[in-house]
Amino acid sequence: MTDRAMRRESPVERTDCLVVGGGIVGLAVARAVAATGREVVVLEAADSVGTQTTSRSSEVIHAGIYYPEGSLKARLCVRGRKLLTRYCDEHGVSWRRPGKLIVAVDDAQTGRLDVLLRHGHTNGVGDLRRIDGVELHELEPDVQGVAALLSPSTGIVDVDGVVGALRRDLESAGGAVALRSRVIGGRVDNGGVIVDTAEGGSASARVLVNCAGLGAWDVARSLDGFDGPVPPRHLAKGNYFGLSGARAPFQHLVYPVPVDGGLGVHFTMDLAGAARFGPDVEWLDGDSDAGDLDYSVDETRLPDFEGSIRRYWPGLPSGALAPAYAGIRPKTSGPGEAAADFVIDGPATHGHARLVNLFGIESPGITSCLAIGEYVVGLMGGEAR
């Protein structure tokens, strides 16, 4: 079934576990399930894996600073960071640890640094520390700020490399990926799950794991027999701009104090040293079809970008930014609301022994992917055997 869509003329294919969604989280979940000896098939709507939310990110390995104590984001990010860096080392995937600065540009923002410092220490980020403006200037002379948090554990990673390694692991364990297989409906009951795809195929399994990202809400609502909770869906588009004709201006990743809906327009670099800034937050209609979203960069947002960046980098040259790419984050909290936790619902939440739903897997989803895989296997218990 690998690399082809399921066709109508094929019989209904039965497996232990179907994973809907071939992003980095879906592949990590499928790999974790396959490692338990279960048969796993990933159903991916696109022509290749990891091309939607996964490929339109900042490619950052987060330390675990921003998230409330005990939240899934806190627990899975800290655990996932350790798993991911070890996984990259074992599989030859490139990554490195430049560290991150979260910069308070004035005294009014320093209280927020204290809150983040407490969160980080509570969550187990032991190397996180606050620095004053003098040390900040020593580390990054061109960054303007009165204080900052220094996170040595924050890194960057070749996300495409991780996606490729996860897929190879899955297939080596006997799993498969069915591309061009968009789930449009199905049914779930005590005997298992059957799903239908837009391409005319069907598949059945003992357990379904819904990792469809932006489309997870649609998949859940399309399943006859499922009457469990589905959280609200909010979509936050984030534009990125690259620094034209110049390499990274800083040695560290540089973030502002977080803003409503995101972490603020921050500076990151890729492993080749190319610099980019983003994402901003552009709220979209939460009822938009996941297949019809506009990923073009909104160039009219450039002046706001420049203004945000110059708060911590006054030396940004005029005309230095060029459109790079845009991503869309699946969220369960909207404008003006506190950032929501990951929603990973198993039988204890919705009462369906054959289904696990994942909603709102935004940042730090990439960092957390392997830990999410572990967590989902724990929720499944013995149901997929």
Give the location of each predicted region.
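Short beta-strand to alpha-helix junction loop
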Residues: P68-R79, V103-R112, L149-R168, S296-R301, ...
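Central helical "cap/lid" subdomain
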Residues: G50, E199-Q251, Y295, G382
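Flavin (FAD/FMN) cofactor-binding core of flavoprotein oxidoreductases
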Residues: V134-H137, P232-G238, T300-I366, A371-E374, ...
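Helical element adjacent to the flavin cofactor pocket in flavoenzyme catalytic cores
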Residues: L149-V207, D218, L370, L379
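Dinucleotide-binding Rossmann-like beta1-alpha1 core, especially the glycine-rich loop
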Residues: E59-E135, G145, G264-V265
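N-terminal Rossmann-like FAD-binding beta1-loop-alpha1 element of flavoenzymes
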Residues: T15-V42
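Glycine-rich FAD pyrophosphate-binding loop
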Residues: A35-R56
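Active-site lid/adjacent beta-loop-alpha segment flanking the redox-cofactor pocket in flavoenzymes
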Residues: F226-L235, R247-E337
